Amino acid sequence: MASAELSREENVYMAKLAEQAERYEEMVEFMEKVAKTVDSEELTVEERNLLSVAYKNVIGARRASWRIISSIEQKEEGRGNEDRVTLIKDYRGKIETELTKICDGILKLLESHLVPSSTAPESKVFYLKMKGDYYRYLAEFKTGAERKDAAENTMVAYKAAQDIALAELAPTHPIRLGLALNFSVFYYEILNSPDRACSLAKQAFDEAISELDTLSEESYKDSTLIMQLLHDNLTLWTSDISEDPAEEIREAPKHDLSEGQ
């Protein structure tokens, strides 16, 4: 049976199979079909998490590749190996083309289907955060006007998500915390604003700490995990100089979190 003929439930099941097989490109295809079938109704929590996980894995592999290649490129430039640098730049360009295609794919889906169909505050924040995330991934490697546009679009999406999150979601809500985590990473990495990054992360952490006793048992694990990541970043950012080049800035976990999971 061709995947185009599958029902919504069957596409969801096939996406789960693809996830188990670690075939994330196909997982994306199955979940895109699901997303495009729901013009007026929202995806379920399970469906939106499957879509997010699929794209996070597909983009994550390329982001990791890009970072490795960029690091090698810097080393070869430092050694004056111009012939190798030319080869590396071409190869990096190939990865950047893939990154752009992936980001464009999910951003188009968010614009055309997911954001317009969302009504619950939780799902609105989830999708606007996702929109900000993928514009941020573009800003990581784009240059000039393209980088500026990507950064501006990231800010608009995160700010819209933040406005709803602060008004509608509890400080301990995993999606609100995940937004604060990624928004602060954007300030630190893309806008080079460590003070603003620390301020945002600290405020989110402190507000969640003050309401920790109100956390439901289902959300406790998810929320405290993201709080730990916020704390890790604050520790990293507030230290004068990080001696360890292997230290990584933490983002919201690959498996996007929601209540009850």
From Swiss-Prot:
One Gene Ontology term, aspect cellular component: nucleus
One Pfam family, short name: 14-3-3
InterPro entries membership: 14-3-3, 14-3-3_CS, 14-3-3_dom_sf, 14-3-3_domain
Molecular-function annotations in GO: DNA binding; protein-containing complex binding
GO BP term, pick one: regulation of gene expression
Family (UniProt): Belongs to the 14-3-3 family.
Described function: Is associated with a DNA binding complex to bind to the G box, a well-characterized cis-acting DNA regulatory element found in plant genes.
Name of this chain's protein: 14-3-3-like protein GF14-12
Biological source species: Zea mays
